Amino acid sequence: SGQWVTVDVVGSDGLAVVQYRGAPWVARPEGNEPLTPGRWTIARVDGTQLVLGRRF
C-alpha cells in the first residue's frame, strides 16, 4: 500500500500491535524476517491483520 507503521514492541508470538488509521491492528511480517521495532511498510491487509513488508 506504500504506507508505513511503527512497530514499538513485538510479542513472544512474533506479532505486534500497531496504530493504523487511528485504530490498533495486529501486524505480522510478510516473509521470514522477524518483526523488530522500527518503521515498516504495509504490504497488504489480510483480514484483520496488517502484513508488513520491509523495515526502514
Model-based region annotation:
Residues 2-56:
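Terminal membrane-proximal soluble interaction domains of membrane-associated proteins
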